[in-house]
Amino acid sequence: DISSEDPSPCPVFEEDSMQVRADAIARRYEGERRLMEAVARGDMRAADMVEETTLRLERVPNKLRNRKNLFIVLNTLMRKAVEAAQVHPFYIDAISAKWAMRIEAVEQEADLYPMRREIVEDYCRLAQTRSMASYFPNVRSMLTYVQFNLAEGISLEAIARQLGVN
């Protein structure tokens, strides 16, 4: 029964609506990719890109929970960005855990907004100070070994043994 009060959806309009959604999703993913690349380079201007990417979605009705979820996603994206910059997981995990706890501790939505810039800048600084992307894998391994074993008596022989080189 076709009624003028409740017309059936027109397939063309459904496709248009789906296309609009698909385009918006593709733009969001592209924005996330650009943001992650900028953070991996340690580019502090990346903080200006955040609002364009992940923080505009409405996934759940509870506004605070929705924003916290989006900030957790942001934290995860930033973590993956600096991982791509060859930052050791030890350093990534420390910052990721710090932000996860701070995000969950927030009780008012407005308190989250200043964090977005802080989160991105924190990860940018991590990429600037701890990225080993410019080193060959064996040099990265050696540097990591030295960083994590400074309190031990480190010798050239111990490093060579650890890395399996002579």
What kind of feature is each model-predicted range?
Residues 27-30, 137, 141:
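Alpha-helix N-cap/N′ positions at the starts of helices
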Residues 1-123:
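Hydrophobic, helix-rich cores of sensory/ligand-binding and other regulatory modules
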Residues 103-106, 124-134, 143-154:
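Basic, amphipathic alpha-helical hairpins
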Residues 67, 112, 135-139, 156:
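The cytosolic transmitter module of two-component sensor histidine kinases
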Residues 89-94, 134, 156-157:
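Short acidic alpha-helical/loop segments enriched in Asp/Glu that coordinate divalent cations
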Residues 95, 135-138, 162:
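Short, conserved alpha-helical segments within structured domains
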Residues 157-166:
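Append "Primarily bacterial transcriptional regulators
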